[in-house]
Amino acid sequence: MPTSSTAADAPIAPAVPPGRTGRVARPLGVVRRWFDTGATVAETVDGDRIDWLRAVPFVAMHLACLAVLWVGVSPAALVVAAVLYAVRMFALTAFYHRYFSHRTFRTSRAVQFFFALVGASCVQRGPLWWAAHHRNHHRHTDTPLDPQSPAVHGFLWSHVGWFLTPRGFRTHWERIPDLAKYPELRWLDRFDLVVPVALAAALFGLGALLERVAPQLGTSAGQMLVWGFFISTTVLFHATVTIN
């Protein structure tokens, strides 16, 4: 894997979004911490421990896949799951990775935002967080400063552990000055669960509609939610972190 990067060679330090202070926020409730990543933006104490409160949505997404035992499967649900996997994998590969992280091509601001939205539905945080950490990964590949290195930290930590910590949760704004100037991207980064929740709700609604108007498809609201969102997203996550 190449170790060059377009990011500035500045040391990683606690950073805050443009226009915000570095004051440590008081606890604001678990729900706000899930939906507003800026609620404790300057958290630094014990930065390498797993924050289990913030990890709840990630764990719940995996457990929700077990609901397939109750909702069953249908060709319609499988098609939706496969299509959403492919479309979102493209958004991650072409835009989160090649465009936002490495800036390998140019596009319009509208296209940039559209694929940032699609990428945000993958439940892999916002495009700014993703790009900042990926740039840091390339800058410090296989060194103690690279939490994604299985050679240094072990497979399990590099696969699912590092981003569940306070240190991994922060967006390192000093790595992405070229992206942080866009307020719409900063909003997506701060409220990174809004798009996934909207997609899950839309899939539930689609399943309910199909169950009513096209019962011959054999699908339902719960089935479309489980296959189209939970299973598709979980498989997408593990495919992504296996590569990146």
Name what the model sees in each region:
Residues 1-244:
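Non-catalytic, topology-defining segments of multipass membrane proteins
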